[in-house]
Amino acid sequence: MAVSVKRLINDFDLEVLVEGNEDVKIEVNDVNRPGLQLAGFYNYFAPERIQIIGKAEWSFLQDMQIEVRKKRVKKYLSFNITCLIISRGLDPHEEFIKEARKNNIWVLRSKSVTTKLISKITLYLADKLAPETRLHGVLVDVSGIGILITGESGIGKSETALELIKRGHRLITDDAVDIRESDGTLIGSSPKITIGMLEVRGIGIIDVTQLYGLSSVLEEKEIKLIMHFEHWKDDNDYDRLGIDNQYMDILGIPVKKLTVPVRPGRNIAVIIEAAAVNYRYSLMSKISPVDIIENRMSAVSDEA
């Protein structure tokens, strides 16, 4: 993943002082304040990072003798820098403009305070550069829990999502789920062209937002649980106690997975609601229902 400098300019309303190479891409989510570099120290310098000059760096340059400043700026901008942003609306020194034009480096300006600008850019890049993947399935928010419904085509994922929406829960995406990893969590969202849309066999595509209101759709949701649908098989030994701990790896993060056998007569929407509430209960409770039953059996045995 990469972010173009032009996109950064548009998203942060940056003023362009010097236009640089249009093919340059931002590929790391860190920034650098070049105080050490302007002092002549280049060990561990990362020119691929966005360079931000704030009041401290600007004042340091301002106090330099002109010839020294020219040499320092010339060396600094001789590196293959992605782009340079000057904060607080400060005026760049002439040496920066001259050397940036010579080396085809973007020089931008922001009115924001340096620390706030760094914080915003870091969070922005962490989001835009996060590892991504796309999975086939339906993502819904059930009782505040993000549940990814998977299974073969035609097994009833979208129909179940529709029933959940009717029961007051919310849709994030149907059919294609875009997933990105952010700080150890998985965030699911919808491709732009299918936001708020749900495909139901026999009816076609329905606009969930128009039929059920704006509150029935979410832009994104953290994925906490996977419900995998499969056709009921009589010879399968399905989990009946909730002790089978299955996980699915997505972008290196394990997500709890429950296999739900599907056959006529089973109310799958109600089962998913129960799974969501039970998942929340498991996070809050130190004892599982199986443990409670075992304790009761022990108590009965002791009484006998």
Curated annotation (Swiss-Prot):
ATP binds at G151, E152, S153, G154, I155, G156, K157, S158. Mg(2+) binds at S158, E199. Its EC number is 2.7.11.-, 2.7.4.-. The active site is at H136, K157, D175 (proton acceptor), R240. GO terms for molecular function: ATP binding; magnesium ion binding; phosphorelay sensor kinase activity; protein serine/threonine kinase activity; protein serine/threonine/tyrosine kinase activity. It comes from the Bacteria. Residues 261-266 are annotated as: Important for the catalytic mechanism of dephosphorylation. One of its GO terms (biological process) is regulation of carbohydrate metabolic process. Disulfide bonds: none annotated. InterPro entries: HPr(Ser)_kin/Pase (IPR003755), Hpr_kin/Pase_C (IPR011104), Hpr_kin/Pase_Hpr_N (IPR011126), P-loop_NTPase (IPR027417), Ser_kin/Pase_Hpr-like_N_sf (IPR028979). Keywords: ATP-binding, Carbohydrate metabolism, Kinase, Magnesium, Metal-binding, Multifunctional enzyme, Nucleotide-binding, Serine/threonine-protein kinase, Transferase. It catalyses: [HPr protein]-L-serine + ATP = [HPr protein]-O-phospho-L-serine + ADP + H(+); [HPr protein]-O-phospho-L-serine + phosphate + H(+) = [HPr protein]-L-serine + diphosphate. Catalyzes the ATP- as well as the pyrophosphate-dependent phosphorylation of a specific serine residue in HPr, a phosphocarrier protein of the phosphoenolpyruvate-dependent sugar phosphotransferase system (PTS). HprK/P also catalyzes the pyrophosphate-producing, inorganic phosphate-dependent dephosphorylation (phosphorolysis) of seryl-phosphorylated HPr (P-Ser-HPr). The Walker A ATP-binding motif also binds Pi and PPi. NCBIfam families: hpr-ser. This is HPr kinase/phosphorylase. The lineage of its organism: Bacteria, Bacillati, Bacillota, Clostridia, Eubacteriales.
